[in-house]
């Protein structure tokens, strides 16, 4: 199993199983700038040009499901996004099958119905994010009643962190646990070999 150094969860031998619903025609930045120019929007240096959403479910939900069933799940999820965001603004929708749990990365240009560039109006604050999550769950549970609503950030008080940082934290915790396990079993007879194992980590 070959792994990316930046993302140890990726199994490159399964990357050919990934699939697109929306394939980017150019770089995200270039596509966003094109749509923004066509809409006649003015931008600032700190304007959000692309919003990324991550769509998934628990590993248990996907367990035993065939590729066609997984694809159907994400098509239904994409339908929800299209109900609330103009389809032409969706510049990429790709399902990753090469990690532990199938998930879809979806990117769109945050253009409002009246042609403004405003991620704040679309995604907004924590309250608006909670609304998106609630409405998404209501949509999905119509077809998949076994799905449970995840904990809302507005209830837990936890801050959202990007997937990359979350994965790095999980990886570091895993390394810490391995090191502690090796150290706990270290004695004068195996100290050198244990030190070598820790260095390899």
Where are these predicted regions, by residue range?
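N-terminal nicking endonuclease/strand-transfer module with a His-rich metal-binding environment
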Residues: 1-201
């Amino acid at each position: 199993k070959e792994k990316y150094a930046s993302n140890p969860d990726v199994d490159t031998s399964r990357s050919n199983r990934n699939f697109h619903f929306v394939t980017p025609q150019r770089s995200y930045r270039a596509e966003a700038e094109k749509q923004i120019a066509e809409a006649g929007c003015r931008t600032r240096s700190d304007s959000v040009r692309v919003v990324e959403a991550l769509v998934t479910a628990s590993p248990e939900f996907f367990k035993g499901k065939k590729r066609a069933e997984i694809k159907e799940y994400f098509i239904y999820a994409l339908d929800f996004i299209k109900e609330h965001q103009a389809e032409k603004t969706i510049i990429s929708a790709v399902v990753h099958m090469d990690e532990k749990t199938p998930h879809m990365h979806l990117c769109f240009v945050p253009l409002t119905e009246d042609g403004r560039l405003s991620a704040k109006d679309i995604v907004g604050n924590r309250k608006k994010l909670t609304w998106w999550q609630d409405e998404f769950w209501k949509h999905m549970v119509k077809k998949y009643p076994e799905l449970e609503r995840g904990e809302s950030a507005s209830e837990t008080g936890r801050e959202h962190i990007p997937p990359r940082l979350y994965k790095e934290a999980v990886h570091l915790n895993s390394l810490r646990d391995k090191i502690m396990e090796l150290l706990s079993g270290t004695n004068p007879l195996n100290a050198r070999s244990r030190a070598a194992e820790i260095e390899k980590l």
